[in-house]
Structure formats: structure tokens, C-alpha cells
Amino acid sequence: KYKGQHCCHNDFMLNKILKQDWGFDGAVVSDWSGTHSTDEAATNGLDVEMGTWTDGLKLLGRPFTYNDYFLANPYLKGLKEGRYAVKDLDDKVRRMLRLCFRTNMDRHRPYGSFATPEHADVARKIGEEGIVLLKNDKGFFPIAPGRYSKILVVGENAVRSLTVGGGSSELKVKREISPLQGLKEKYGDDRISYTMGYTSDPSKYNVDSLKQQAIAMAKDAEVVLFIGGLNKDAHQDCEGEDRQIFELPYEQGALISQLAASNKNTGVIIISGNGVSMPWLKSVPALMQSWYLGSEAGYATANVVSGEVNPSGKMPFSIPVKLEDNAAHHFGTKAFPGDGTDVVYEEGILVGYRWHDTKKIPALFPFGYGMSYTTFSYGKMATNKKVYGKEDTIELSFTLANDGKCAGAEAAQIYVSQSNPLLERPVKELKAFKKVFLDAGERKVVSLSIPVKELAYYDDKKQDWVVDSDQFTLHCGASSTDIKSSVSI
């Protein structure tokens, strides 16, 4: 709920903001079991009720048919009795028809295709560009084919299916390439050994035996790749249940430390949808942040690990050093997890890097951070003028050079700060970015545009977007904390 009304039929959020202020002309669809009232669903902006009294798979509680939906017979009865306006019904129908015609009811829409080689290529490329290199001491990565003859892969996530589970994020793929399969195809079966090391289901395995076997095998390997992280089980990267710990589950942290003690040439690949604590970080020379990369995960992983693809991903969020550095945990239990009924949103607009910047709390890995197998240098940023009107567009440019020996891509970022805001504002905010591909030794002039109206913030008292007449500073950087040059306008 938000301010006492369920979000699926919240008058302020749906009618006032979404449909009136933003001019949204599409259809609002409820979450499964998100509808709770015919009165509110009829008048507060909900257009399509879905999955009432189900979790998407089975009925919850009493028997319930489609006719029992809040927007079915109860709504029809209210319309006939004059309790609900027909104009609201007409609006719902228009929105649903508009959605249909925009999608599958277009007679001229070409036939689609499923699971083609082209789809696989796109999935692999997205995965490759998303992987983030976070640490790479002494050139641990890339591991070129032929560099080692005895490579040990440890970790359940190297073989576990990560397209299924998690609720609504589940994929139904034609095939799924695991990281282990991708690595074996890249380096050859004879060079890759595998052991689980830990398990998410201790009832089926002797946990200590798994750990001891991994430690013993690590001593005999030339290089160790630990592939772990989270999965889509309950209380991890799954809808409906919050995580209960910030640490890696299944004692993975202790296992990483023990593997590193047995073999100093141990690199870590974390597969997860969000951050984890890393007390073991100093004990390993290299770390990659991977994600749930879909059907081609194994090929994407192997291509980046081997150097066939140069990593170019940047962190889409900040990873705090400890849980208490996160804004939601700074204000105590009233902010999270709340009192069982209410959660007080104390941090306001200071979320993620805005919190770390404004409160001067260093992140372990900041928003926008990501390494490469090459190095980039930034020239000084310049703007086309110094004074702008509210309808103008800021044109900025800088030179970006690849100073290394291999091709790569850099996602350059532009942040903006305001000198004297009238309301609380973060130290700076991301306003533009561009990923630039450069060959070894190549340099390019990078140009970006920022409409002045993008500098606006929302004044809740005026209920409008406001651009103050003030001095703003543009910052060009490789991450939210790695600023290369700044220009005031």
C-alpha cells in the first residue's frame, strides 16, 4: 500500500500521476492477487484485474472463479445499480482496445520467430556487455586459451540452471548454456576440472566433504575459478521474500577464503542480481560481477574470461562495504523492515550512489564502476556555451582515447550537480552516458546532449518540475566516484 491504498488501485498514483500528469494512455494491469476492492478498482485507475486469489500457479484460499473477480460480477452489479460511472468503464475499455491494437491485433504485423540463431547471438552479446570486471590484479584476467593446462572450476552456480525460478523473472528457454559448459568448449575438456564446493541443498550432500574436496583439488590446479553467488531460491533473488543476510549463502565466503589460501591464483565470478558483502576480497586477485545472463550465459562468460571479448560493463548500483552503509538500514527498523504494517521511507531521494555521495559514505564498488583489459584516458570536457535558457540543450564534448593494446569499450558518464538548490538535492546525478568502442590506440571526440529541462527536479509542494536559475556543474567520469573533468554553466 501507499498512503493507505493498494498500489494496484491507488487514486493518487494511477489517476493523478500516471494518467493525468504523465498522460499515460495505455492500460494498467494488476499484479496477481494485487486487487482487493471493487470500489477502488472501479474508480482508482485499474483497467485489467489479473490473478485474484492466485499466486499465478494455484488458488489461494477459497474457491474463486473469474466471475468472482472484483471487476467481474461485483463491478457489473454496481454499474447496474448506478454506483459506478459508465464513463470510467468506457475509459477502461478504450485503454484495453488501444493496447490490443498496438500489439497482436494489427493485421499488418509481420510474423515473429522464436529461439533463432539471431536471438541467441543477441542474448550472448547482451551478456558479454553486461559482465563487470571489478578487480584484476597482476593481469589475472583474461585467461587466454593455452595459458594454463589445469583449470579448476568450483561452485554450484557453474552448473545450476539460473533461468528458472524466482517467480516472474523465470525464462523458458530452448537451451541454456551453463558457465561450465561454456568454459569447457572454450578451453577443452582435458584442461577443465570441476567440483561443486558448496550446495544449496545440504540434505543431499555432505557439506564438509564438498568443501574439503574443492580445497584439495585447488592445491593441484594452476588456476581456480570460483563461480558462485546467489540464486533464485527463497530469500535470495526471488520475488515475494527479502534477503535475510548480506553475506554469500551456503558458507561460500569461507570457502573462497580457504580456496585462496590453498591456491593464490584464485579468481571469483559472482552471479547475482544484487550486491553481497565481500570480507574475502583482499585474499583473491580478481573478481567479476556477472548476472543472470539467460540462455547464452556460459558462452558470454567464457568469451569474457578468455579475452575474446573485452569486458565493458559498469555497475548499475553501488555495493556497500557493509549493510549498515545502505540508506534503508541507516535509520533503524522503522525504515526496514518496518513494524509489520508500515515502512517509513526516511532516505527520500537519497538512494544508491546519491546516498553514498551526499553522506560521504564510500562504497566498496561505486555506481558506474567497471574495469577493462585496456586503459582509457579522458580529455577535458567543454560545452558549447556557458549560459542556457530553459528550452535550450547543453551540447558537451570531450576526447576519449584507448591507450592500451587491445580494442575495448568505455561507458563514459555525465553527472550534474547544482550549487544552491531550494530543496534537498543529491551531490550529483547521472544525466547522460555513452558507450564508446575504440580500437587499440584510437581516440574519438565524444559528444552528448542534455536538454536543460533534464536538470529539473520535482517540487512536491508545487506539484511540478522546476529548473532553478542557478549555477550547475557538469562532471565527466568513468564512474560516480572517478570524475575526470568538470565544467560550470
What are these regions, as identified by a protein language model?
Residues 24-61:
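Short acidic/histidine-rich active-site segments
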Residues 45, 62-105:
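Long, well-ordered, tryptophan-enriched scaffold segments
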